[in-house]
Structure formats: C-alpha cells, structure tokens
C-alpha cells in the first residue's frame, strides 16, 4: 500500500524526523489559506499522487507570492500529471501539499528497503539526491552506499554516522543526520513498511538537515496491525480493478497488454506471462486465483479481465495440486456464461481431476481452445489475440 507525501511526512514527524512545515489542500482557496497560515516569503506547491517524478512533470512549483500560490494551485489541481511512473495517461491530481520554502544547498538520498538476498533491512544512501535514484544506480553505482542492518540490534549510531559521512553530510551536521536516519529506521520498522525513502534529504546553508520529501510503501499483509496506516489509503489513487479484486481475495495487477491471464499460484502466473511475451504477446494482467479458488472467485476473475476494453483473448493456465481442475472448469464455464464471453479463451489444465475438468469443458458447448503444454497455450492465445 502506498501513501501520499504529506502523509509520509506526518509519520516522519512522529518519529522525530525534521520536515518542513506544511499542510494538505484540496481546493485552490484552501491552498492560499494554508500559505497565509504558514507565512512567506516562499512556498512550495506540490501535487500529491502516488508516483515519483512530479517535479519534472510540472507538479511541483515554487511560489514567491500568494498570487502565485493561487495560480499554481489552479494549474496543478485537476491536471492529469504524467511522469515516468504514471504511464502516458497520467494521474489526476486531487490534492496538494503547501509547504514553506527551503534553503537548498545539498540534496542527498536515503532509503530503507528489505533485501530478499540477505534477508535483512538495507539502509541506502547517495550524494546524488533530488533525482531518479534508478538512473544514478545505473550510471554511477559507485555513488550508492549500502548498510546491512541486523534486525536484532537495529540501526547502530556508528552505521548511521558512517553512511552520513559517505554521502557527504558535513561533519557539523552529522548528529542531525544520525537522528533523521534513526527516526527513519524506527518509522520503517514500527509501521511494517517495505520502503521508506527521503529524496531529497536537504542540508541547508546553515547546516540544518531536513527531509524535503517522503515516500512509504507498506506490506499489505501487515495492515491488520496498523489501522492508523489503513486510514491513509486513497482509493482514488488505486486501480479500480485491483480494488474490486481485493474484495474477492484475488491477487490482481493491471498491465498494458491485451491477453488476460487467469492462473493459480504467483510463480506459475509470472512464468505464464513470461511465456506469452516469449511468443510475442503482451499480458493484460497478473491474476492469481490462489489455491482455494471457488466458482464465484473464477467468475469474478473473468468479470475483472473483461472490464479491460483492450482485451483480445484470455489464457487460463491451471496446475491442479490443492486446486482441483474440475472446480476451475466449473468456474470457467460459469464465468464465461455469466459475462457472455466474447473473446477467444485458451485453457490449459494439468493435475488433480485433469481428465474430469477437460471433459466438463468439452461438454460445455463453449468455443474453448484447449492446450496440453504452457508453450502450446501461449502460442495459441497469442495467435488468437492477433486474430489468427
């Protein structure tokens, strides 16, 4: 689960991390009112969407008068903000963050992530803040510094000081940087975050260290422990299909292709998408119905996929272990009839009750294209999507 920058800063503030004074605004008049309350002479008007690259897309403006605050708020609110993370369609801006201006002298980068290789938390930092860290990592990997944090001990002061020194924090500002890194780590740990990022971490001309941005991602599996985090959820920023899928315990992610995928198991789902791409197709979604799929879940999965206007074909790829093939077949038949399926459907099933499942599909009277292997299924669905 993602949250907005201003919400991330609320969390950082609770853990003692220095952030600029600011408040969210949901209208132009409210933006001006917040600016008046903060006092000038400089304010920053920032679009709030769940994507990075807002500045380059025109979603961050520096205002030097209340008239400019009004002008920029009017420009940004309601716009379709396009960044490298939103795709060409962009995301609509429904809220702003109005902040006091900052004296920017040195922009740094720090973040915390879970490293699946070491199975520990990794603190990362770079002297190249204020820009896309992916670009820095690709072109100048030597500028990315990493610290492995032992969960049993937490982030040590010596580790925080060492990283701060490596990324260029002046010696006089090291104690402030240490406090910010410790606060960031505690926020990450206590909220069950999967990512906590400050970019940029600013060192001002007088040596003050302040987090000018905040980005958090949270482990959705741990949200039951954090109602205060769930309260930050903004459904307007999420894919409606993914929201609908969560109601039926379906793991669904929308993609840009035209071939729908219905699979049981995340690993098989990813392998299925890879195989489709291998044969020249493009998956329209990731959809894992899980090991306990019911007829209702399969029917809802079909409904979700068919809401995509660009859908050209569907591939159902099932390995029947815990999940029985006859149950999937029943769901495929019911789902196809319930939604009046009007795109080609390729089905490949292997495992428990495989023969029964295939017979049910054959006897259904539906124009289902059968396949015995994943490669054959992928080739057939790619051809069907192309109208061949």
Swiss-Prot record:
Residue sites binding ATP per the record: 46, 53-55, 99, 102, 107
Pinpoint the ATP-grasp domain residues: 9-244
Give GO MF terms, alphabetically: ATP binding; magnesium ion binding; succinate-CoA ligase (ADP-forming) activity; succinate-CoA ligase (GDP-forming) activity
Q: Which domain of life is it from?
A: Bacteria
Bound cofactor: record note: Binds 1 Mg(2+) ion per subunit.
Quick one: a GO cellular component term? Answer: cytosol
Pathway the protein acts in = Carbohydrate metabolism; tricarboxylic acid cycle; succinate from succinyl-CoA (ligase route): step 1/1
The positions annotated for binding substrate are 264, 321-323
Cofactor annotation: Mg(2+)
Indicate the enzyme's highest-level EC class.
ligase
The transmembrane segments are none
Q: Which Gene3D superfamilies match?
A: ATP-grasp fold, A domain (3.30.1490.20), ATP-grasp fold, B domain (3.30.470.20), Succinyl-CoA synthetase domains (3.40.50.261)
- Name the coiled-coil region(s): none
Q: How does it assemble?
A: Heterotetramer of two alpha and two beta subunits.
Looking up PANTHER family in the UniProt record yields: SUCCINATE--COA LIGASE [GDP-FORMING] SUBUNIT BETA, MITOCHONDRIAL (PTHR11815:SF10), SUCCINYL-COA SYNTHETASE BETA CHAIN (PTHR11815)
User: What does the UniProt record say this protein does?
Assistant: Succinyl-CoA synthetase functions in the citric acid cycle (TCA), coupling the hydrolysis of succinyl-CoA to the synthesis of either ATP or GTP and thus represents the only step of substrate-level phosphorylation in the TCA. The beta subunit provides nucleotide specificity of the enzyme and binds the substrate succinate, while the binding sites for coenzyme A and phosphate are found in the alpha subunit.
NCBIfam families attached to this UniProt entry: PRK00696.1, sucCoAbeta
* Protein name as catalogued: Succinate--CoA ligase [ADP-forming] subunit beta
From which source organism is this entry? Burkholderia multivorans (strain ATCC 17616 / 249)
Tell me the classification of the organism that encodes this protein: Bacteria, Pseudomonadati, Pseudomonadota, Betaproteobacteria, Burkholderiales
């Amino acid at each position: 689960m993602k949250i907005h920058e201003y919400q991330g800063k609320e969390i950082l503030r609770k853990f003692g991390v220095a952030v600029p004074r600011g408040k969210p605004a949901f209208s132009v008049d409210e933006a001006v009112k917040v600016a008046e309350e903060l006092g000038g002479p400089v304010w920053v008007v920032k679009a709030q969407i769940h994507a990075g690259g807002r500045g380059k897309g025109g979603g961050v403006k520096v205002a030097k008068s209340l008239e400019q605050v009004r002008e920029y708020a009017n420009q940004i609110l309601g716009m379709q903000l396009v960044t490298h993370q939103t795709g060409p369609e962009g995301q609509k801006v429904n809220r702003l963050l109005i902040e006091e201006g900052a004296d920017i002298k040195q922009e740094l980068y720090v973040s915390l992530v879970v490293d699946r290789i070491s199975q520990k938390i990794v603190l990362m930092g770079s002297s190249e803040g204020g820009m896309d860290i992916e670009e820095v990592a690709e072109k100048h990997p030597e500028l990315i510094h990493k610290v492995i944090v032992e969960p049993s001990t937490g982030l040590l002061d010596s580790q925080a000081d060492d990283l701060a020194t490596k990324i260029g924090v002046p010696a006089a500002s090291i104690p402030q940087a240490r406090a910010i890194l410790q606060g960031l780590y505690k926020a990450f740990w206590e909220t069950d975050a999967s990512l906590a990022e400050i970019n940029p971490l600013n060192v001002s001309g007088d040596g003050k260290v302040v987090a000018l941005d905040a980005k958090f991602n949270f482990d959705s599996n741990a949200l039951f422990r954090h109602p205060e985090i769930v309260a930050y959820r903004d459904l307007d920023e999420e894919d409606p299909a993914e929201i609908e899928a969560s109601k039926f315990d379906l793991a669904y992610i929308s993609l840009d292709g035209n071939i729908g995928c219905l699979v049981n198991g995340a690993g098989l789902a990813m392998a299925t998408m890879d195989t489709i791409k291998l044969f020249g197709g493009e998956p329209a979604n990731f959809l894992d119905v899980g090991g306990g799929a019911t007829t209702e879940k399969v029917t809802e999965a079909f409904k979700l996929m068919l809401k995509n206007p660009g859908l050209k074909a569907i591939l159902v790829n099932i390995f029947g272990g815990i999940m029985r093939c006859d149950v999937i077949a029943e769901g495929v038949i019911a789902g196809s009839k319930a939604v009046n399926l009007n795109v080609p459907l390729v089905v490949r099933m292997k495992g428990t009750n495989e023969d029964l499942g295939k017979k049910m599909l054959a006897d259904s009277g539906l124009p289902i294209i059968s396949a015995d292997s994943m490669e054959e299924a992928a080739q057939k669905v790619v051809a069907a999507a192309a109208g061949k």
